[in-house]
């Protein structure tokens, strides 16, 4: 379980959010929503341990993330605005590298399946530097199909993704939470419309 208590973030003397408090349990799909500038990305970066908070605490499985950093990072998959893919490697090589550092199943079949799911079949051996920005984003998203991590934190994962791609990701997110995972995301897309699966946390007015 992820526990956020009394979280406050101030940037350039402006309070983005104050005394924010929530718990997210396994099996939950949560969307952080709010207008631009309300601190959605800041919140995700703080929760992952990449950003600084002014007050408050964050616990994962009952322990402060500062004290259980290794375990927390083993359980976490974070996709931010930067794709994190290596431009000099191909799409396939990027996913092989990802698998190697996370000690996950390194079968070529799983990699090809992941790339097919994000619409990159036939582009496996193209250097990422030659792919469009949207395709580079898809290489990063393909990691989700290879992930064994419980906690997925995704900042605008649907950027440059078409309607069919959104449906594929909706299905993936549903399966992940149905199997006891947690998904926390920001998006401007209308996902899971009227679905009881989706819980929303709103920042700002």
From Swiss-Prot:
GO cellular component, as recorded: plasma membrane
Keyword Membrane found: yes
Catalytic activity: heme b(in) + ATP + H2O = heme b(out) + ADP + phosphate + H(+)
Protein task: Part of the ABC transporter complex CcmAB involved in the biogenesis of c-type cytochromes; once thought to export heme, this seems not to be the case, but its exact role is uncertain. Responsible for energy coupling to the transport system.
EC number(s) given by UniProt: 7.6.2.5
SMART domains tied to this protein: AAA (SM00382)
Protein name per its UniProtKB record: Cytochrome c biogenesis ATP-binding export protein CcmA
Keyword Cytoplasm: no
Domain of life: Bacteria
Gene Ontology MF, one: ATP binding
Topological type in the membrane: Peripheral membrane protein
GO terms for biological process, alphabetical: cytochrome complex assembly
Lineage: Bacteria, Pseudomonadati, Pseudomonadota, Gammaproteobacteria, Vibrionales
Alphabetized UniProt keyword annotations: ATP-binding, Cell inner membrane, Cell membrane, Cytochrome c-type biogenesis, Membrane, Nucleotide-binding, Translocase, Transport
Compartment(s) of residence: Cell inner membrane
């Amino acid at each position: 379980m992820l526990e956020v208590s009394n979280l406050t973030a101030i940037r350039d003397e402006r309070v983005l959010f104050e005394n924010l408090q929530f718990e997210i349990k396994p099996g939950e799909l949560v969307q952080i929503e709010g207008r631009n500038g309300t601190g959605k990305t800041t919140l995700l970066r703080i929760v992952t341990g990449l950003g600084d908070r002014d007050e408050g605490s964050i616990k994962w499985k009952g322990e402060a993330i500062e004290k259980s950093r290794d375990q927390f990072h083993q359980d976490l998959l974070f996709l931010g605005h930067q794709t994190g893919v290596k431009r000099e490697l191909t799409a396939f090589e990027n996913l092989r590298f990802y698998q190697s550092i996370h000690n996950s199943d390194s079968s070529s079949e799983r990699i090809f399946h992941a790339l097919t799911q994000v619409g990159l079949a036939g582009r496996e051996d193209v250097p990422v530097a030659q792919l469009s920005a949207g395709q580079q984003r898809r290489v990063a998203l393909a990691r989700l199909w290879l992930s064994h991590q419980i906690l997925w934190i995704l900042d605008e994962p649907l950027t440059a993704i078409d309607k069919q791609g959104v449906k594929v990701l909706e299905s993936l997110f549903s399966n992940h939470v149905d199997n006891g995972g947690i998904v926390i995301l920001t998006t401007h897309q209308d996902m899971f419309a009227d679905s009881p699966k989706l819980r929303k946390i709103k920042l700002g007015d």
